[in-house]
Curated annotation (Swiss-Prot):
Positions bound to GTP: 13-19, 41-43, 306, 332-334, 415-417
Residues reported to bind substrate: A300, T301, T302, G303, R304, R305, R306
Record's keyword annotation contains Signal: no
E.C. number: 6.3.4.4
Protein name as annotated: Adenylosuccinate synthetase
Main localization category: cytoplasm
Reactions this protein catalyses: IMP + L-aspartate + GTP = N(6)-(1,2-dicarboxyethyl)-AMP + GDP + phosphate + 2 H(+)
GO-annotated cellular components: cytoplasm
Organism superkingdom: Bacteria
Binding site for Mg(2+): D14, G41
Length: 432
């Protein structure tokens, strides 16, 4: 039996993690975010009602679940307050269910200004960030000048630290990026206005998780973005600024790494990507348009149209290695309904003619990579909302089996629609 279960994306994000976390938290006592910030967009549909969460863990909708934002998350007070208000307006007592690590770095207005100034300066070479200040906040953390939630306990010292760091960043904004300076007093006033709310939710997260482990409580760790966006192992430099792989759980929450029991990789039945960067199986034809339309592939955070393509099992195998995956949850299988044939990328052809079955490590090595496909019959029957494996068309079952063969990982959960009820749990991670 697994008490500590990790749910993370195996592609470039947008795999459907939020729904699965919400579904599995029916048995969990805690749900923990351990990396990223409000650049995530987790969409839940419960009884037909849609909820989009960016910063707060997906377990917040469950009354018997405590949601935790761990130290690996960069926290925007403004974004958190906005999200809390939206949920509280719907009658959800967020402050009774949410806890924070005092080590969470804060995202403040100057981080957002820097993020957007840099993207503008890059021009055609822009990375395609969400413009929410995530990267600059992580930079401040690593440079040891960042302000953290715990700094809000001493407001006088916080004001002094803020003044110093803002002088540094405003110098960059004005003199290098030729942008406007960010107003110190406004940032201070805005942050002080919510300081007591934030500090009232602070706990020792590492200690709490260790006590939960000793009691045998079920804990769900909710990843954001996807494996191929990992700062170290992703398609650098077109990546996010945090460790999206399973290794980020220990560093971003304080749970000892030996205590992770099961890692569930969320795998979309096809591939998508937002923003710039390598995408070998990207489709520019009517099939790509079909996947975008049928899958409603528009970012929950940015509203940007996602790039679409066939499932890339070469890239997914890299995710298997990096995360030591225990099982997959296959999502959006129903989007492939109606296609006469479906394709799986099984290898890459490099510019020099070599065929490889692993992803390139250097950014430049992705250039000119061509996907090698295996083509399988599609299916005309609808899989939408099917709740039993026996109800799936044989061609869909063959597709599922082939994914398992190519990756070496079992598909333990199949999602056939956005609602939590439209799911087949073949093996529950908490029972594995």
């Amino acid at each position: 039996m697994g008490n500590n279960v990790v749910v993370l994306g195996t592609q470039w994000g947008d795999e459907g993690k939020g729904k699965i976390v919400d579904l599995l938290t029916e048995r969990a006592k805690y749900v923990v975010r351990y990396q990223g910030g409000h650049n995530a967009g987790h969409t839940l549909v419960i009884n037909g009602e849609k909820t989009v969460l960016h910063l707060i863990p997906s377990g917040i909708l469950r009354e018997n679940v405590t949601s935790i934002i761990g130290n690996g998350v960069v926290l925007s007070p403004a974004a958190l307050m906005k999200e809390m208000k939206e949920l509280e307006d719907r009658g959800i007592p967020v402050r009774e269910r949410l806890l924070l690590s005092e080590a969470c770095p804060l995202i403040l207005d100057y981080h957002v200004a820097l993020d957007n100034a840099r993207e503008k300066a890059r021009g055609a070479k822009a990375i395609g960030t969400t413009g929410r200040g995530i990267g600059p906040a992580y930079e401040d953390k690593v440079a040891r000048r960042g302000l953290r939630v715990g700094d809000l306990f001493d407001k006088e010292t916080f004001a002094e630290k803020l003044k110093e760091v803002m002088e540094y960043h405003n110098f960059q904004l004005v003199n290098y990026y030729k942008a406007e300076a960010v107003d110190y007093q406004k940032v201070l006033d805005d942050t002080m206005a919510v300081a007591d709310i934030l500090t009232s939710m602070v706990v020792d997260v590492s200690d709490l998780l260790d006590q939960a482990r000793q009691r045998g409580d079920f804990v769900m760790f909710e990843g954001a973005q996807g494996t191929l966006l990992d700062i170290d192992h992703g398609t650098y430099p077109y990546v996010t600024s945090s460790n999206t792989t399973a290794g980020g759980v220990a560093t971003g929450s304080g749970l000892g790494p030996r205590y992770v029991d099961y890692v569930l990789g969320i795998l979309k039945a096809y591939s998508t990507r937002v923003g710039a960067g390598p995408f070998p199986t990207e489709l520019f034809d009517e099939t790509g348009e079909f996947l975008c339309k049928q899958g409603n592939e528009y970012g929950a955070t940015t509203g940007r149209r996602r790039r679409t393509g066939w499932l890339d099992t070469v890239a997914v195998r890299r995710a298997v290695q990096l995360n030591s995956l225990s099982g997959f949850c296959l999502t959006k299988l129903d989007v492939l309904d109606g296609l006469k044939e479906v394709k799986l990328c099984v290898a890459y052809r490099m510019p020099d003619g070599r065929e490889v079955t692993t992803t390139p490590l250097a950014a430049d090595d992705w250039k000119g990579v061509e996907p090698i496909y295996e083509t399988m019959p599609g299916w005309s029957e609808s899989t939408f909302g099917v709740k039993d494996r026996s109800g799936l068309p044989q061609a869909a079952l063959n597709y599922i089996k082939r994914i398992e063969e190519l990756t070496g990982v079992p598909i333990d959960i199949i999602s056939t629609g956005p609602d939590r009820t439209e799911t087949m749990i073949l093996r529950d991670p908490f029972d594995a």
